[in-house]
Amino acid sequence: MNPMRDQPGSPYGDSTPRSPFSPFSPLSVDDRHRNHADTKTPRSPFSPFSPLSGDERHKSLAESKFQQALASSGQLDPLSPGSMHHGGHKFHEVFQMKQGRYDLQASKISEMMKSSSLDNAPTQSLLSVLNGILDESIERKNGEIPQRVACLLRKVVQEIERRISTQAEHLRTQNNIFKTREEKYQSRINVLEALASGTGVEHEIATQQLRQIETEKSMWEEKKKHEEEDMVKLMKQNDQHNLEISALKQELETTKRKYEQQYSQIESQTKTEKSKWEEQKKNEEEDMDKLLKENDQFNLQISALRQELETTRKAYEQQCSQMESQTMVATTGLESRLKELEQEGKVVNTAKNALEERVKELEQMGKEAHSAKNALEEKIKQLQQMEKETKTANTSLEGKIQELEQNLVMWKTKVREMEKKSESNHQRWSQKELSYKSFIDNQSQALLELRSYSRSIKQEILKVQENYTDQFSQLGKKLIELSNAAENYHAVLTENRKLFNELQELKGNIRVFCRVRPFLPAQGAANTVVEYVGEDGELVVTNPTRPGKDGLRQFKFNKVYSPTASQADVFSDIRPLVRSVLDGYNVCIFAYGQTGSGKTYTMTGPDGSSEEDWGVNYRALNDLFKISQSRKGNISYEVGVQMVEIYNEQVLDLLSDDNSQKKTLGILSTTQQNGLAVPDASMYPVTSTSDVITLMDIGLQNRAVGSTALNERSSRSHSIVTVHVRGKDLKTGSVLYGNLHLVDLAGSERVDRSEVTGDRLREAQHINKSLSSLGDVIFSLASKSSHVPYRNSKLTQLLQTSLGGRAKTLMFVQLNPDATSYSESMSTLKFAERVSGVELGAAKTSKEGKDVRDLMEQLASLKDTIARKDEEIERLQHQPQRLQKSMMRRKSIGHTDDINSDTGEYSSQSRYSVTDGESLASSAEAEYDERLSEITSDAASMGTQGSIDVTKRPPRISDRAKSVTAKSSTSVTRPLDKLRKVATRTTSTVAKVTGLTSSSKGLASSSIKKTGSTSSLAKSSKRWA
């Protein structure tokens, strides 16, 4: 049909989009002639058939091609992997990144020139290669092009010239095809004239001509399909232009950032130079020379920047002139081709008029040709209907083209606005350049003043040398400066400590705080193993069996508290960690140590304690309530408390209503959003510190406690207090979740020292086993092993999110200073030292955005639309079967006219459904693009990651669809494919914007139950959901 489509040497290939008005489009000569002949439809000013003057067409074409050439360097970069893969050749092996620029290697360029990679590459990629070479030459300061790059550029230009010549040959072949078609039409006219004789042989020839007309009808239908494909390609070009505009905006932003960075660097350099001048007054003459040299360097940099600006302007003007010359040549060729097509159209019109006159003469023939005459009239009516349909299709296509041209005008205005902005930026930077010059002049004046000041200082030094007493005063001043420096040393040391803590937080290390328990009244302080407690987290322990330096052992932690430290001092250091829970972080604080080392005192405080003796649990919740009240104008918080214990490897609920019979709880294999993986544990909402005290008292009363030889009230279980926080931003509607786990571990003990038997012995065995499992987990994390044994005990399963997740974790190491507990103290300190080296990774917050829900609703509506279109396709696919059955029955009778009427109704009905589907798909895609532009700007600030499991709905096409014609099947499925593209784009956008959908249910969806309480507060409270 069209030799351009099947031509293997076509420079554009099969994948490049072509305009239906391009001389290289897949439309035939008749199609272009018919489009040109239809003068009733409005033309766009950017069309080659526009009634504008020649100069205006030249200007418009030059502007459009210049914009496409500028955008091609950003859109289809020859160095990007996408364009290389499109051309089928590995151009990215030739260009390599080197310090932000493309380094062209001589060996690879020579290989590419010898091979046939340039012959098979698309023309657009060759133009982008040429633009990339020119851009790289502009970025260089000298503006020269290397020899190997010049050879490659010459090769690319020769390849483009060769392709232009091949395109001219294709035009000649099309002319030959048009001449052959004219000969065919002439032969048909001769056949119609021969029909006047009325012989039977001539009648058969006429029927053969009618068959040929039917084949041409099918060819027209195929040409319609090609036109629709061209429209789809034009839509893709529209999307590509949008991407090009966004790329230009990004480039402008990068240039702004570069200029601001240069400005900040110059300011920092000037500040450092000032400080050097003030400190080095004695060597002022040498420093003056250095400053003069730096001043010369600044002048050189300014001159270099001016040269670069001039080179860029010259290159820009050269490109403009080249593009204008190319567009002039192309427009002259198109105008000549248009004139030829108009002349050929006139010839065809004259032939058509002669044909119509001949048909009128045939109507006057005898009865023998009457049947053939009626058949010809019916075929002529069908052809007229086809012409009307093609005209309507052309009008719709031209309307769409006009819309696209309006979009191009809008984009051109946007580009002009961007150019104006760039000019304003250039003016602003020129003003900054003037300010820099004034600053340099001020510096030079300051240098002159410093010279005069240095001379005066020299005179003063001569006077000081003469006076002996003044020298002692100078020595005194120096001693004062040394004392000030010694005082500043402590401030610098505290700043370094703060920076180290921030570094540890970024790494995600487990912070370790060591607290030394004071001696009891009955014990003597002389037998202590603690030799020294430093302010920088240093702890020195001495071995009582090895006195002297050999028995000393030093440990380093984040913080070490002496026996005199109060509960308020301890909580002041962990307050920032606790407050981060309200920002959506998970925090875990647990106390570790041997029996009787003060773990419960640190976490809870003494029994019946006042507010001054409160432990970490009460103080943390009290601080959370205060902050939540201060933020209630912006964020509404809900706080819930959960308290469980692990007793003999069983998880029990400490806030359960039935105290006599505790219920054993299960642990889920996957952690929920509410922190602990124990959904059956009771959870109570709290609004004040008094509610927390009541619940804590209930939990402590239910906790397993026993007496041993080492401690009268020893904890025989691990208790975990979990505080769940849910916050909702009143302005944006975003939801955040935070969890605070406060763990009081049971103490490790030696059975021979604790003197336990029976149940207490079994309890001690379970406690030591769980603590040893915790040590195995810590050792695996410290060594970064691939397998971490979390399932070895219930304790490690519950602490899995804190030890292996993205949580902020802190461990209190409780130390018994008694000399009799030296071995237990050493094992505790070694364990803590190993824990401090574990890196968990940076903690991350959990937030849920409002835009995620909107996207999911929009995705559901698109799926419903696709389902409706699937049902409509199935309905349309059933109609051809019924038509075929009716045709088979009517053929036996001979009613062919009814069949034609039925097929006409079916084609019109399917055409109406297709147009409805196309309008629905286009409106859905436009709505999606508007929504996507609003959401992507908000999603960039959220910084969340994740994935959404969206199952694509497969198209439901039955096997009976094979009976449908090619026209109906492709035209019906086209709007459905468009809708599916919109749905898939929405799915990918949701997956990039958020990672919180799987965990967005929050505390509201957790299975939290309440069966009653033993206290008045627990009875009146409801379940927190």
From Swiss-Prot:
Keywords assigned by UniProt, alphabetized: ATP-binding, Coiled coil, Microtubule, Motor protein, Nucleotide-binding
Region of interest: Disordered: 1-87, 263-286, 881-926, 939-977, 994-1025
InterPro entries: Kinesin-like_fam, Kinesin_motor_dom, Kinesin_motor_dom_sf, P-loop_NTPase
Signal peptide location: none
Compositional bias (Basic and acidic residues): 29-41, 270-286, 950-962
PROSITE patterns assigned: KINESIN_MOTOR_2
Pfam families registered for this protein in UniProt: Kinesin
UniProt keyword annotation of ATP-binding present: yes
Family stated for the protein in its record: Belongs to the TRAFAC class myosin-kinesin ATPase superfamily. Kinesin family. KIN-14 subfamily.
Record-given protein name: Kinesin-like protein KIN-14P
Organism expressing this protein natively: Arabidopsis thaliana
Lineage: Eukaryota, Viridiplantae, Streptophyta, Embryophyta, Tracheophyta
Gene: KIN14P
